[in-house]
Amino acid sequence: MKLLLAGLLLAGCALAETWSYWIEPCTAELAKQSGCTSADAELGVWALEAWQKASAGELRVAAASEEDRARIRIYWAWGTQSLYGEARSIVVDGRRGAAIFVIPDMARLGPDIDAVAKRDPLFRDTVVYLTCVHESGHAIGLPHTAQFADIMYSFGFGGDIVEYFGRYRRALASRQSIPDHSGISPADRDKLVAIFKK
């Protein structure tokens, strides 16, 4: 019986689509330019693992040995004010992927976000984490939505953006509780599973 269960588990793993990833190390020079921290890579990993958990066994994420082998690549960027992140399509070994650019410097995201982040470092981690989740959702194939509850909500629809992040922040007891709160809504989850059922 144990062998049968083990076989079924292995078969389930084999059916999952693997998405390899690579996350840019935050060097001292990059930290000065972008505002990243060495701990931000962990937020990126948690974001990808959140999609894995939400996929009902359809998606598996795994670290790539090299940047150019990764289907999802996360970079710490700096640039246009109020642009939280961006996902640009790439093709890796004939398979769809994305280069993701995340802005970790709260000062570039406007005075309201910056003011809260300065008072509360965990709010800053919330913004970086949820941006990683949102942009990696695009990488996997999820579009924007107009529903404020969704991680794939587009800020182009307006709303209280500080509160968008604030409601998530209030669910956290500490940074280490982030993996327990994916930020992914039931509607996001349904759309994710539908992608892999096609």
What are these regions (language model features)?
Residues 12-16, 64:
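Short boundary motifs at domain starts and secondary-structure transition points
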Residues 16-21, 72, 150:
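Hydrophobic beta-strand segments of well-ordered beta-sheets in folded domains
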Residues 3-12:
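Sec-dependent N-terminal signal peptides
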Residues 40-147, 157:
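Metzincin-family zinc-dependent endopeptidase catalytic domain
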Residues 17-45:
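Fold-level signature of zinc-dependent metallopeptidase catalytic domains
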Residues 98-119, 127, 143-198:
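Metalloprotease/metallohydrolase-associated module, dominated by Zn2+-dependent proteases
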